[in-house]
Structure formats: structure tokens, C-alpha cells
Amino acid sequence: MTKTEKKSFHQSLAEWKLFIYNPTSGEFLGRTSKSWGLILLFYLVFYGFLAALFTFTMWVMLQTLNDEVPKYRDQIPSPGLMVFPKPPTALDYTYSMSDPHTYKKFVEDLKNFLKPYSVEEQKNLTDCPGGALFHQEGPDYSACQFPVSLLQECSGVNDSNFGYSKGQPCVLVKMNRIIELVPDGAPYITCITKEENIANIVTYPDDGLIDLKYFPYYGKKRHVGYRQPLVAVQVIFGADATKKEVTIECQIDGTRNLKNKNERDKFLGRVSFKVIAHA
């Protein structure tokens, strides 16, 4: 048996050149121009068909969707609650009354958040009568004014620091928006402290009331200029309190369909936060 002779570099190079282009058969990379044309045509038609099929299925799906109202809304039967400003760590508002730098961010966030609620920003909105639902047929939807004065001591009008410098900090509570939600009753926000005799809790508007005139909400695109109703929670620590640390829990009350208890979601319709005010 003879050993296979090893090809020289020049032989290998010649074979590669012949593979790349064979002048005798006119093949390029082992295929004739006709063969290359057919295979390119096949893949062009194949991937073109896939792209067309994908585009068609997406178009069909988009025809079933409404650009203004979500198609499926049954998974969100009742709204949750959110607080503002958002603290940097969890839901703990920790600051020092004697150091403005520690609560500067809270104050700035509140001012920026409440700018759309100013009289100037709402001059083109509707002054709706209170106490009743504001049903609208469209296609044009009016947005009701929410006067920032309803927040009273937490409006930033009389106290530009929103009570933080006096040990009476304000936190805004808002209910998540759900399109075409209609409360069955008169909703309001109640807040309690888990610790006794440390701080008093005051809500604005009075009794934490959320007026029915802000319902129903018709969606961001249809209900242009909508102002979400707010409830301000002011934590008033006693002047002689040695410990200025309290946990507040707020929840939705006053209606039969806005829930604040759920075995699967313990935060449905409620929110809990802590306020720690150092001297």
C-alpha cells in the first residue's frame, strides 16, 4: 500500500482557483450561472412569501384592535393606588427637617407634577358640576378641571415646601386610570397609621373624596387634557413627638365595585408607605 502523496501548495491553489471559477464549464463556486439564478430565485420567492405571510397576519391582527380602547380589559376589574413623589428607596420618605437638601427632590417633584393642575394650564378645560358621573358620547370628549386649591395645605400655594420643613409632609395618592370605569358609589381614600399617637393624618380634598365628575375616563387619545383626580395625604407629627416615624396605609372605600381586598393581590386598591422625619 502506498501512502497518499501530499499535495503541494501550488496544486491546492490551482484546485481552489478552479473551484472558484472553471473556465471550461463556466461554473462559479461549483454552479453555472443558470443554476445560481434558479437557486436565488427560489430563495427570493420563498422568503418573499414568508414576509408577505407575516405582514398579512399582522395586518389582520391589527384590524381587530382599537387604537383608542384596549380590546381586553377584563383582567383589570379594579384600580390600584399609587403615591407621589416616588421615594428613592421602596416607599420610604426619609428626610431631615433641618436639611433642605434631603427633601429638595420631593418638593421639586411635587411642583413639577402639579404644574398641569395650575389655573393657567386648565383654563381651556371644562368646569364640570360635581357629584355626578360625566358620561360623554363623543367623538369629542371634554376634560374636567381639577383645581389645585382642592389640595389645600398640600397644594404648594401657601407652603412651597409642602410641609416637609415643618414636619408635616404631603404625599399625593392617585388611583390608576381604567378606561370607562364607573364607580358604583362615591369613592374616597381613607388613610390610617399603623402606630398610635405618633401622627395625625389629614386628607385633601376633605374626607379624601374623589368626585364622580372625573368618571368615566375615555382613554389617553380620546380624552385629551384629562386631569386625574388626586388626594393629598398630610402627615402631621406632634411637636413633642420623640419618634417621628410612621407607616400609613391608604385604601379605596365607598363603592361596591372598587375593591381594596383580594387574596391574590394584597395591594389591590390600597398602598402603604412610611414617613421618617428627622430633626
Curated annotation (Swiss-Prot):
Residues 1-35 are cytoplasmic. Residues 57-279 are extracellular. GO terms for biological process: intracellular potassium ion homeostasis; intracellular sodium ion homeostasis; membrane repolarization; metal ion transport; positive regulation of potassium ion import across plasma membrane; positive regulation of sodium ion export across plasma membrane; potassium ion import across plasma membrane; potassium ion transmembrane transport. It comes from the Eukaryota. NCBIfam families: Na_K_ATPase_bet (TIGR01107). This is Sodium/potassium-transporting ATPase subunit beta-3. Glycans are attached at residues 124, 158. It is found in: Apical cell membrane; Basolateral cell membrane; Melanosome. This is the non-catalytic component of the active enzyme, which catalyzes the hydrolysis of ATP coupled with the exchange of Na(+) and K(+) ions across the plasma membrane. The exact function of the beta-3 subunit is not known. Keywords: Cell membrane, Disulfide bond, Glycoprotein, Ion transport, Membrane, Potassium, Potassium transport, Signal-anchor, Sodium, Sodium transport, Sodium/potassium transport, Transmembrane, Transmembrane helix, Transport. The keyword Disulfide bond applies. It comes from Rattus norvegicus. Expressed in distal colon, proximal colon, ileum, jejunum, stomach, liver, lung, kidney, spleen, and heart. Expressed in the brain, testes and anterior prostate (at protein level). One of its GO terms (molecular function) is ATPase activator activity. Induction: Up-regulated in distal colon in response to K(+) free diet. Disulfide bonds join 128-144, 154-170, 191-250. One of its GO terms (cellular component) is melanosome. The gene is Atp1b3. The chain crosses the membrane at residues 36-56. It is a single-pass type II membrane protein. The C-terminal lobe folds into an immunoglobulin-like domain and may mediate cell adhesion properties. Residues 186-279 are annotated as: immunoglobulin-like. The sodium/potassium-transporting ATPase is composed of a catalytic alpha subunit, an auxiliary non-catalytic beta subunit and an additional regulatory subunit. Interacts with catalytic alpha subunit ATP12A. Belongs to the X(+)/potassium ATPases subunit beta family.
